């Protein structure tokens, strides 16, 4: 669709826009947009408050203030008269008054006809001046044979009338073409020109006399004090020169317009290309010519601008404004305040200045004022228009308010957080929404949220009004609205009715990842706070200390269905970051389950036998048996499914029988805290706890070891196994095929149809799923049968209506997908119930002092005294004394901790110990502060970059520890000492949160357009993975098992005996991964995102498993956004503190935190600390020698590497190492390119220069994983791979061959491959380039979409380059589609496969006759 969008843009549907292009607006375009000229600076009349005619708010130009009212005669019309002309009066006809709604004031534009040409500010100020690059003006100064390039500053002076330029020499030798005449040299230049001109005329002639007089006057002025200070009269001299010769000298936008008019773009292009070829030859001859490289880069930039104009076919003169558009009135409102005062948008003030100056210029011109006055007025007009376009970028003379605040210009309204892109296009305010404080809702089911009645009444108002009118409770909308406002009791039944099958979406800010927005079924509550299910709080990172959440309501049937199928809390059980459940019980629930699962030897009722589960419960209620007593039940009472094959009696505690009763009958029985792989360990456990008939139970139980109760980690493992067993395996369509074949006569015996179905892996359904599906189907059919019988008898052979089948399908589908959540709800209820019954409380007597504390403290004090003695004798330095003291106190605190651990080991009845051991709250570190010693405190000393580079000791820890515990009480000095650490902790957290949020934003912009778009890209280029090992500590950071699980293999995997363990092209599940690792295989080649062939996207096989669903990723999944969120969300947990490591600000401290992560992702060239030296060759370390120099500060080592050249000759390379750097190699070691020779961070560009992209990819992956794993955060490789792929997605061209690429230009790697493929197929010379690494800050700016790039940063620069090249945005990514109001090309709007999670068809469609 190539329709040009002009005044008729309102008629074009936004959904029909397929691509967007920018171009320079011509004066004719502006007139076409405009409804009239604004020629008066007034806004509104101070008496009537009505807009002034011809002013900035004129109703005739910008539209009426009142709907369908004539702005001339004031007559009112109906909506049907819209867009017609008012002909009520003669004046109406003359003025052409149009009948419009007041919405017209949001899109009707005006214009100001400028009385002088004005150069658009962006084109000479942004990105080193587009005008300067395009004109590329050069001048031959004097006798010089090398031309001088006119700088952008000189051109700016020209635009602002500070200097003049020679446009035509007229054959005068004293005037060089394009010479800028500055005030300092003007006198001499003009004098020489006039002397040259006078020779053309005979002496005594009128012209000769006039010129002689001018030369005499000029000589007098230049020699006078005034002339030296203020310069000559340019304008008079220009007129004389133009009158008596064909030379032409001018200034301002007129001069630029003349130059732009004369420029021959194609000739300029040829000249630049010829100059480039010459520079390139010189560079090839001598690679070290830096100045030539800089010259080449400047020429390329110029060529880029010239080509942009040639390819877009635009006239460069259009950069000059003749008609200035005036934006619609309601986009720059004027608001009335109290006391007849007004507040106005800054734009109005800027427009007012332009109109005043423009009108004044018009008057001066009409009055034939002196040229100098007119030129000054033109300069002021140029400055006024500049201020309107971009006031912030003006280096001087910014237009400010009385208070000195710079006015907000149109550019400022586009850029930044509060600009159009980020505030209004990417982040809009949403209708049908509200917010309130959250409180816990312990009685809610997992898919429910408590919505306050008052909020529901407002949010669902339109539906409630419809219901009230339909049921004749009110007669009009107005009455219904009043009833809702007054909270009339009549409305509440209707509120309850309308919220059925209407999900709500809850969002908690900051929205760090997709689990911060989830959907729920609303349950009305009478309070004013939203009730939240306790298990979903982890996803939202919410607590109940005053947190607020926003509520949103999906309205359309499609939105409701999408919300229910994709956003309900029961679909968000696994965290996308690592694929582990995020809904694990915590705090009270953990404490209750810990208490419930405790075992106690010799408890009341131990060894009792009960014939039924109910009998045991009754005995427990009558207190004849304790909760922790081990009792016996018949096996068939506990596990009837297994009892068919196994008989006997089962031993466990009353609590564990209660706990296991909530799990489905076919789930393994939980005996103890050994819950890893319950299915596999089940047979061995059953032998131990299932006794044959006739056994002496009491005697057997007395000899049985007491098991540990379930703690938080064990419960999390159980939740994972519940998910793996009961997560839905079928698609909705599969269940629909069964329902379609059932009727009331056969539904009980034909549920066997489920056995014929196959799950997403093409395997038979497991027994738990078959039994549950049968149970749900029989129950729902019987419920429907009873419901229909109420209206009369129902025949058994009656065929169900389509809508009845759809209703059944929805209910069965919900129950089937809710199996995991229903078990989790039971666990939650049990946890809360028994934490209450446990009676856990805290008393000061629960805190037991560390037995050997004082011995340890005494030992520490003696050690410190010795250190002080050594220091006083000069045996150690002050820094050494400090470091040793810190190390000693750290060790003492650890000793006290170990002592405390031993003392509380068997104290299971202590409430504090129970909380700690269960994982409900607190840990041993908190307990040490309570009962041992507080230990070392942080100081607010900041480690600087220079400290890291010089390995200085930074005293970021208070040397004297807090020896008291909280139980003993702190001394006043200790209390004061601990305040520093508390403040540092708070400030660090605040700073870290902001930095982490900015990191997430950058990452989202880097990867936003990466979506899974295909099944397979058929790449044969794999990625070899092995254990990621930290070479310094020799520990495994990420094991091979984690790296291959859920990924596709690129090659077959064989064990040492040659037996195939897994085939190429198959996905590695957990069992296969364990098999591969058990076989001792160290390296596996997998399919990777880093080698996927799909442009700007990824295929299913290169991505592998979707961690959030635990199955193969679906086409349409926005994996780029998920990757950015998964890396950014835990960013706040990454510590920025270095004090905990012992006070020395060395490289090791710095490399472990947030700072290093930013360095890697932004590809910093100057990282913290001394960068590591790396080997540039394959070779051997032959010598490491001391570097002895006179200056002691420069001591160090020389490492000699012996390597072979390309001619197979031996050569040596010597690398200098500073003494403070730690060596990682020794003589005789073999080294490879990119290998570290000393400790320190590697600079990414250096690594890429000596090795290849794959080495850099591995380094980045390892380093980023190391940073997160050091903090105990696990992130999947694939997310980091997506970001790394984007960082290495650009190629810098070094030879352009027969392509259209420029040497030195940066192009997308996929475009590079595509163009080269075409050239090779045509037997032409391909281009050659090097892969370059770009940081997260630069990648979004290099995007193919100017909308996405402009909404990120450097908006004006991106837009300027897009305009001059008429760049086309094909709307392929996510951001650009949101900006233009389209659905994003992902999820349910993508080309998803049938039966995938995005296939959310209307359930009726499965039963429609034409669908069969």
UniProtKB/Swiss-Prot annotation:
Mg(2+) binds at residues 543, 545, 547. Binds 1 Mg(2+) ion per subunit. Its EC number is 2.7.7.6. It catalyses: RNA(n) + a ribonucleoside 5'-triphosphate = RNA(n+1) + diphosphate. InterPro entries: DNA-dir_RpoC_beta_prime, DNA-dir_RpoC_beta_prime_bact, RNA_pol_asu, RNA_pol_N, RNA_pol_Rpb1_1, RNA_pol_Rpb1_3, RNA_pol_Rpb1_3_sf, RNA_pol_Rpb1_4. Keywords: DNA-directed RNA polymerase, Magnesium, Metal-binding, Nucleotidyltransferase, Transcription, Transferase, Zinc. GO terms for biological process: DNA-templated transcription. Zn(2+) binds at residues 1017, 1092, 1099, 1102. CDD domains: RNAP_beta'_C. Disulfide bonds: none annotated. Pfam families: RNA_pol_Rpb1_1, RNA_pol_Rpb1_2, RNA_pol_Rpb1_3, RNA_pol_Rpb1_4, RNA_pol_Rpb1_5. GO terms for cellular component: DNA-directed RNA polymerase complex. Its cofactor is Mg(2+); Zn(2+). One of its GO terms (molecular function) is zinc ion binding. Belongs to the RNA polymerase beta' chain family. The RNAP catalytic core consists of 2 alpha, 1 beta, 1 beta' and 1 omega subunit. When a sigma factor is associated with the core the holoenzyme is formed, which can initiate transcription. DNA-dependent RNA polymerase catalyzes the transcription of DNA into RNA using the four ribonucleoside triphosphates as substrates. This is DNA-directed RNA polymerase subunit beta'. The gene is rpoC.
